[in-house]
């Protein structure tokens, strides 16, 4: 249940049961180096490969959300892809280090994402065409009946997607340093004395839910006396 709205959080087996094994296998056998930003550090690439080991299992699980289907009082629904495998970048502007960072979402740089996103749209179509909703007479206005083939649907997704639902994470990931991590389990930055990071950037991958409550939970663990926060303050 979402505030003032309804939402469904569904795993890939519920969305595309006939294709889930093929999708997971395709990801497992990819050459990830071909789909990461140019100049990606070997440690960061190693981290992506470690995440892939987890993702190939996640994609097959019914209880891990791949689709967040937002249902509200408006005459539309927006399928949100919870676990994209494409990776973007956040960099300092070399011409002005004090300016806003340069952000590249890297959306659909891994072709598997466009395939999964198309599956999400097909699922939403089936949902609104289901017998349960027939009494309400839903009418599809977008993408519309003329968008029928896989190629047409993928092209429509590319033209209409929004690259973010404002859940950015991972720029200071809690991972081992040799996997591209920035902070350890105590949230202290590697190689810097007394500096810790406590925000959404430490989450290595987007959780299958809005990030707000996850960040609250991290902050609570840090702020309570005798917990992680005290250890951070006393570390020399």
Predicted regions and their residues:
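Mid-to-C-terminal "cap/lid" subdomains and adjacent gly/pro-rich loops that border
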Residues: 1-74, 131, 145, 152, ...
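Charged, low-complexity surface segments at secondary-structure and domain boundaries
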Residues: 8-14, 102-109, 136-147
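C-terminal structured subdomain/cap of oxidoreductase catalytic cores
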Residues: 76-132, 157-236
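Active-site-proximal substrate-binding core of FAD-dependent oxidoreductases
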Residues: 135-150, 227-236
